[in-house]
Amino acid sequence: MAMAEGERTECAETPRDEPPADGTLKRAEELKTQANDYFKAKDYENAIKFYSQAIELNPGNAIYYGNRSLAYLRTECYGYALGDATRAIELDKKYIKGYYRRAASNMALGKFRAALRDYETVVKVKPNDKDAKMKYQECSKIVKQKAFERAIAGDEHRRSVVDSLDIESMTIEDEYSGPKLEDGKVTITFMKDLMQWYKDQKKLHRKCAYQILVQVKEVLCKLSTLVETTLKETEKITVCGDTHGQFYDLLNIFELNGLPSETNPYIFNGDFVDRGSFSVEVILTLFGFKLLYPDHFHLLRGNHETDNMNQIYGFEGEVKAKYTAQMYELFSEVFEWLPLAQCINGKVLIMHGGLFSEDGVTLDDIRKIERNRQPPDSGPMCDLLWSDPQPQNGRSVSKRGVSCQFGPDVTKAFLEENQLDYIIRSHEVKAEGYEVAHGGRCVTVFSAPNYCDQMGNKASYIHLQGSDLRPQFHQFTAVPHPNVKPMAYANTLLQLGMM
């Protein structure tokens, strides 16, 4: 998605060699110029549209593919970005930005070795380019770190961070005046104090943070992979989508819709962290409410509650900056126990991403998923976190490069087989904060307004009433936040403007 303000801006490139000026090629250049203007205005969808039209007229121009690849990167369509970058290189092996684009796409997909190969190519061609060297060195560090982690994982049985913690011996210093758990328990007073403390940009004491993490892990690991909830006719529940570290917008949700309680239950549908630079504040607030109301405050896993995403998009860096690497490891353990889906009254299924790459998946199949792991590259767990709907029937290759895209016929068949009415998912920015697709059978909700301080989108949350379960949408807009830019803790390669 769009980068934070203040980062090095990478603009769509203008072709160096003007093609022959016949009518078709001239029109392609005009379309490319229009696309560049949309790109500069951060209207990436229209930029993609006009680059695509230029490509139709002149499919042999590598720069058109390179430019569209960058626009796809901005809209998180990493699979499409990878394809365009590869095509640009095929057309012109000397087109260096094609290698940059492909490396960025592979980085976004967690394919660090493939990214390193492309950075290595750039360094060989431009050995004196400091920027290229820096990107190569940073990517090389990640590859070595991943290799080290794999070696450790293969040499010993997995040991929980909890086993190495001695929370009781942690001392809360006299000068700390912030919120503390009461007799080791989260209370409503603690939660109100915590939100105000965070609003004032202060840090929760590490002992309290560890207490919350250890306790919420105990709660989550007892849950089913598919949480099943019954609403009485007079009861309602609020469903929120991605919040992505936008803490002040989370506070606004509670201001507009009321604090969580036993009579005001919530479901937060994944992607609590990354991108926004208040992810620690968001996730500890959500975990606190989960401890306070374990049966009325629900958290589902998103594709950003995973190590690969956290390493790139900021959460790992943020936890290390505000606390320690050990605490990040504990967050990672806790994320692995987050449920993957929730079913309301046996009729509405909620998951972060969407439906499946293969037919015939049942609710019982979801229940049987062993979720306590990093997600695989394919299969039902991957699909629940990563897939997206598409308007045409059938399935197609994912624009993200992970999982699939599924059409209205796929949704209809899944719902009929499992006796469901519709699904609610998140995972995608929507200009109005929500979208109803597939004939009302596939609803998207997104709760991070003006995503990354750049997209200008509204956000929304959904009310479901037990009496009819029809989604009632409530839109809201972004509120001011302190001058800490999104992606402030993201991987150095992101901060260098490569994504």
UniProtKB/Swiss-Prot annotation:
What SMART domains does its record include?
PP2Ac, TPR
Query: Any idea what job this protein has?
Result: Serine/threonine-protein phosphatase that dephosphorylates a myriad of proteins involved in different signaling pathways including the kinases CSNK1E, ASK1/MAP3K5, PRKDC and RAF1, the nuclear receptors NR3C1, PPARG, ESR1 and ESR2, SMAD proteins and TAU/MAPT. Implicated in wide ranging cellular processes, including apoptosis, differentiation, DNA damage response, cell survival, regulation of ion channels or circadian rhythms, in response to steroid and thyroid hormones, calcium, fatty acids, TGF-beta as well as oxidative and genotoxic stresses.
Gene deletion effect? Animals are fertile with a growth rate equivalent to that of wild-type. Males weigh less, exhibit reduced fasting glycaemia and improved glucose tolerance, but retain normal insulin sensitivity.
The UniProt entry's GO CC annotations, sorted and at most eight, read: cytosol; nucleus; perikaryon; plasma membrane; protein folding chaperone complex; protein-containing complex; proximal dendrite
Entry annotated with the keyword Aminoacyl-tRNA synthetase: no
Return the annotated region ranges for Catalytic: 184-499
Gene this protein is translated from: Ppp5c
**What reaction is this protein's catalytic activity?**
O-phospho-L-seryl-[protein] + H2O = L-seryl-[protein] + phosphate; O-phospho-L-threonyl-[protein] + H2O = L-threonyl-[protein] + phosphate
Q: Does the keyword Acetylation feature in the UniProt annotation?
A: yes
Organism this protein belongs to = Mus musculus (Mouse)
- One Pfam family name from the record? TPR_1
Q: Which residue ranges are recorded for the region named Disordered? A: 1-24
Residues binding Mn(2+) 2: 271, 303, 352, 427
Family according to the record = Belongs to the PPP phosphatase family. PP-5 (PP-T) subfamily.
Indicate where the modification N-acetylalanine is found in the sequence.
Answer: 2
Induction remark: Does not show circadian oscillation.
Q: Name one GO biological process term.
A: cellular response to cadmium ion
Its annotated compartments are: Nucleus; Cytoplasm; Cell membrane
Question: What keywords are assigned to this protein?
Answer: Acetylation, Cell membrane, Cytoplasm, Hydrolase, Magnesium, Manganese, Membrane, Metal-binding, Nucleus, Protein phosphatase, Repeat, TPR repeat
* Organ and tissue specificity: Expressed in liver (at protein level) and brain, enriched in suprachiasmatic nuclei.
Give the main localization category: nucleus
Q: What does the UniProt cofactor note say?
A: Binds 2 Mg(2+) or Mn(2+) cations per subunit.
Q: What is this protein called?
A: Serine/threonine-protein phosphatase 5
Top enzyme class, one word, equals: hydrolase
Task: State the Gene3D superfamilies in the record.
Answer: 3.60.21.10, Tetratricopeptide repeat domain
Q: Locate the residues binding substrate.
A: 244, 275, 303-304, 400, 427
Superkingdom of the source? Answer: Eukaryota
Active site at 304 (proton donor/acceptor)
